[in-house]
Amino acid sequence: MKDRYILAFETSCDETSVAVLKNDDELLSNVIASQIESHKRFGGVVPEVASRHHVEVITACIEEALAEAGITEEDVTAVAVTYGPGLVGALLVGLSAAKAFAWAHGLPLIPVNHMAGHLMAAQSVEPLEFPLLALLVSGGHTELVYVSEAGDYKIVGETRDDAVGEAYDKVGRVMGLTYPAGREIDDLAHQGQDIYDFPRAMIKEDNLEFSFSGLKSAFINLHHNAEQKGESLSTEDLCASFQAAVMDILMAKTKKALEKYPVKTLVVAGGVAANKGLRERLAAEITDVKVIIPPLRLCGDNAGMIAYASVSEWNKENFAGWDLNAKPSLAFDTME
């Protein structure tokens, strides 16, 4: 059988990435051009800046991905691309490049949900057994997803307000930490003690919903009041207390979901899945099911995860037309 090579594009936010996947599971290349340095001074992602950077580097990323994979344009079998959710301008750059490449070479175009990409990055660790449950935690999303089979996703719980990664970045900004603040807060948390009593919203309620806005507000108020009084708070203890509250919420809801949906596998994915505190809590407390977390290089936004997610769409021949457009608010229940 002839080998299949999928060229995948990811430009949903501030990472320009192009990857090549051979057959179902051999990731030959995963080129990522990060924009973090450009956005640091703004304390967050500026959509217009992100779009311009994507335009500047995407052609070079395509060339590098093909070269690193050791293949030519003529070897590519199909093109996969993130079409949502994300920043509309950023998404359009990747879509335009992917459609142009596919059209020029007469190749099928595979539409991929960005969050499905995070989830299916776990396929890089080992073949996934369905049904499974997934906890998706990133800068823009916090979701519990039931996956009956590859490509069939159902959100069973999600945040009512802030995503967990968003809460980390806002708290980091208050403390004057460099954007993105997640890794630094995680590191500082491991040096401090959980001494501040922050709220754990809805932790005892019998649902699978999350809420982080109250925790974020409590943190900001404590920090602001201390500043007003001229008091000094331990940054390490603040981070430890904040992270402990976040992890208590995530673990409580995940355990409830596992009780409701008796599966054998839990996938934890998204940028926040790189958090050491989360990985430690999962290892210590989730012992009845197999926990699969993608490697660190596949936790953040990258085209490799889009390539993995595209395999099930390829198998279903779920190809898009040239009118495929960006869907910045795309959810699992509104996929093409």
Curated annotation (Swiss-Prot):
CDD domains: ASKHA_NBD_TsaD_bac (cd24133). Coiled coil: none annotated. This is tRNA N6-adenosine threonylcarbamoyltransferase. It comes from Streptococcus pneumoniae (strain P1031). The gene is tsaD. It is found in: Cytoplasm. Fe cation binds at residues 114, 118, 301. PROSITE patterns: GLYCOPROTEASE. Required for the formation of a threonylcarbamoyl group on adenosine at position 37 (t(6)A37) in tRNAs that read codons beginning with adenine. Is involved in the transfer of the threonylcarbamoyl moiety of threonylcarbamoyl-AMP (TC-AMP) to the N6 group of A37, together with TsaE and TsaB. TsaD likely plays a direct catalytic role in this reaction. It is an enzyme of class 2 (transferase).
